[in-house]
């Protein structure tokens, strides 16, 4: 391969560079086998059986022919440079094989071989060498330790799973990207049973080069794929992952992610409350919320959401109307809809009256129960459903007709009634819950209905379609490069931290650090009582733990006594701490205590946290997360999303808090964290007091942790 061609491949868009790997015109198989049951033989057998039209080039020094194809003794003897090369040789031979492929001009390699980073340091070093060789020649490399990739639209199977013995993927427009090859094969089998077409799959293995993000990105940019299912155990390359999610949002293509595993952020964050609340799993959820990605809780949910997403109807302002022949099913669906946050508003009063006039013993509220009488007169189904669309205005409709919906006596006629309404309102999402097999379901499938036996699973999937719709309607906000804000060389004390935050628009109540009791009295007299007294020391982060905070100090004598008490407590309980004096601050009266903070996630950078203070944050962990930076409207959405939000909005006769000021403060904090760069480890504002509307929101306590630098260097 020429140096110029190699550079062209490297400079190509990251996702497009996977095309030779997923849509190859020729495939070499290094370590090819005549035995179609062996790892080096299965891909050849699968491609021959399923009509791969490109060239298959087996390489084996001991065979002149493999499975009816001419074989080559070495990579150097290949008659052409393959688009893709399957590497199925022992681990010690992989490096030289990849180098030989590079010299031959191969554009990509799929390394089945194991024995690399998954087995320890020696394997990791060998893997690094393999990747370096691939990059030297501009090759993309899948694996090592990868099950491979397939594109059944081409009959291409660089995939050694036995699952293909049970059948190839059905035609369709759902792609699979998975870090686990075996689990990806399991998804393939489940999709076949669900009659869900998954023609393209990439299993990334060790992700030495090609990542999960690369694979998702290629799939969402493919004109042959509308929906992506992804399975992840960890996010190994955040840049490619986020680039893929941005591509999915631009393309209007849903990504459903099944991310497993739980872990903590790391010991460096132990300084603040923030550290015990944040975790990379919660942070990931917050990041996914910025994009058109839904996280599935189970494999079944992954399948359900992907299946319904293939209808490509993503309602904005989603609401659910249900027509049913079972009042019990209506109750069950209503419960689940409330649990997942899918609105089921009642039908308008006038529409209810018209439906009652048509069938006096019907329940026309929502769910609309047309009773078993509908089986005698199918025009009831038509009229009731039409009213739900036109009068009720529901964006999504769920029809529950159980086994009656596929009965030989009425199934086809019922499907026809629904088909007419669906065709008259193509922008609405229609789902049918019936039981049946094969031909019994055909009238509904031919009309394009999504079918669910379990209506509760349908509700979860319908709710997901609305979340996709809202995400696609919301423009992505691009983040400019971070950095530029100067931080102190080491973790500052509270007063300095507050001064730094104040310059970013994060205000505190009037306060000062004083060196004597009389100075403290003079300042307190000036700002008015009551006041708060705190030890001022960068070495004592959580002062209340040693009795270093005094509240409700109400006169000059109390200030003098409190000043001396704090100094004694510091000497007794923190004798090594460096004291700057005592901080005197105005004590805010009333309001709602809140918590907000920043934690630097090792993958996604600064993440903001918000919740109510006290028991809400410490015990209930009613906290929301969002990746920084964000605007005021997004901050207000965070505030509204916590379970305790009614306390801020005037619940039980309380005065409404100044939520607008609280949102501005939270947004300012997010921008501060973004501009501060990588040296900012965490910020802990606890409490923040949100005073009644129009009176502002103020940071009462502030802990700011920075990564120390030598010789006073600044960021």
Task: Report the location of each language-model feature.
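Catalytic-core regions of core metabolic enzymes
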Residues: 1-715
């Amino acid at each position: 391969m020429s140096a110029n061609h190699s550079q062209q491949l490297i400079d190509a868009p990251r996702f497009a560079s996977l095309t030779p790997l997923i849509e190859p015109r020729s495939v070499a198989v290094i370590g090819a086998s005549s035995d179609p049951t062996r790892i080096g033989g299965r891909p050849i057998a699968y491609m021959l059986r399923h009509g791969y039209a490109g060239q298959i080039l087996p390489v084996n020094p001991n065979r002149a022919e493999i499975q009816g194809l001419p074989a080559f003794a070495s990579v150097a003897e290949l008659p052409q440079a393959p688009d893709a090369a399957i590497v199925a040789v022992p681990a010690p031979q992989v490096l030289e094989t990849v180098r030989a492929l590079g010299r031959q001009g191969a554009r990509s390699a799929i390394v089945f071989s194991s024995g690399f980073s998954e087995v320890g340091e020696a394997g990791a070093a060998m893997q690094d060498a393999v990747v370096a060789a691939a990059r030297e020649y501009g090759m993309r490399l899948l694996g090592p330790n990868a099950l491979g990739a397939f594109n059944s639209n081409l009959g291409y199977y660089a995939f050694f799973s036995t699952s293909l013995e049970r059948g190839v993927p059905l035609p369709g427009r759902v792609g699979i990207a998975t870090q686990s090859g075996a689990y990806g094969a399991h998804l393939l089998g489940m999709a076949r049973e669900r009659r869900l077409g998954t023609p393209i799959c990439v299993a990334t293995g060790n992700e030495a080069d090609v990542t999960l993000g690369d694979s998702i990105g290629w799939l969402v940019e493919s004109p042959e794929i509308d929906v992506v299912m992804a399975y992840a155990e960890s996010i190994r390359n955040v840049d490619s992952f986020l680039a893929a999610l941005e591509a999915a949002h631009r393309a209007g293509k849903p990504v459903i992610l099944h991310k497993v595993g739980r872990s903590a952020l790391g010991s460096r964050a132990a300084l603040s409350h923030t550290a015990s609340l944040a975790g990379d799993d919660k942070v990931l959820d917050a990041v996914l919320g910025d994009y058109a990605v839904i996280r599935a809780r189970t494999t079944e949910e992954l399948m359900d959401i992907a299946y319904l997403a293939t209808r490509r109807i993503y309602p904005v302002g989603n609401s659910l109307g249900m027509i049913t022949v079972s009042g019990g099913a209506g109750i069950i669906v209503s419960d689940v809809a409330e649990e997942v946050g899918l609105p089921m508003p009642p039908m308008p009063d006038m529409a209810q009256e018209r439906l009652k006039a048509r069938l006096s013993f019907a329940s026309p509220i929502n769910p609309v129960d047309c009773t078993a009488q509908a089986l005698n007169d199918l025009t009831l189904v038509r009229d009731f459903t039409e009213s739900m669309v036109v009068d009720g205005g529901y964006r999504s409709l769920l029809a529950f007709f159980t086994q009656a919906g596929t009965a030989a006596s009425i199934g086809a006629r019922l499907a026809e009634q629904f088909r007419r309404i669906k065709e008259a309102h193509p922008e609405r999402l229609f789902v049918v819950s019936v039981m049946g097999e094969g031909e019994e379901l055909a009238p509904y499938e031919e009309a394009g209905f999504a079918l669910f036996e379990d209506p509760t699973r349908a509700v979860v999937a319908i709710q997901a379609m609305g979340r996709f719709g809202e995400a696609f309607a919301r423009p992505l906000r691009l983040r400019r490069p971070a950095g530029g804000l100067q931080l102190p060389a080491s973790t500052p004390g509270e007063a300095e931290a507050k001064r730094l935050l104040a310059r970013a628009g994060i205000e505190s109540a009037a306060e000062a650090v004083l060196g004597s009791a009389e100075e403290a009295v003079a300042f307190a007299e000036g700002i008015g009582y009551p006041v708060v007294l705190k030890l001022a020391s960068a070495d004592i982060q959580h002062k209340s733990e040693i009795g270093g905070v005094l509240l409700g100090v109400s006169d000059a004598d109390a200030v003098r006594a409190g000043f001396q008490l704090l100094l004694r407590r510091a000497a007794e309980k923190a004798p090594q701490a460096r004291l700057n004096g005592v901080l005197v601050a105005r004590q805010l009266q009333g309001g709602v205590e809140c918590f907000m903070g920043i934690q630097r996630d090792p993958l996604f950078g600064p993440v903001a946290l918000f919740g109510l203070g006290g028991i809400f944050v410490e015990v209930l962990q009613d906290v929301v997360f969002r990746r920084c930076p964000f605007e005021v409207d997004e901050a207000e959405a965070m505030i509204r999303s916590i379970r305790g939000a009614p306390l801020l909005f005037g619940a039980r006769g309380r005065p409404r808090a100044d939520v607008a000021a609280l949102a501005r403060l939270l947004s300012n904090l997010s921008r501060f964290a973004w501009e501060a760069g990588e040296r900012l480890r965490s910020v802990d504002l606890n409490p923040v007091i949100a005073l009644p509307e129009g009176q502002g929101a103020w940071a009462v306590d502030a802990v700011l942790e920075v990564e120390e630098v030598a010789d006073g260097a600044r960021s």
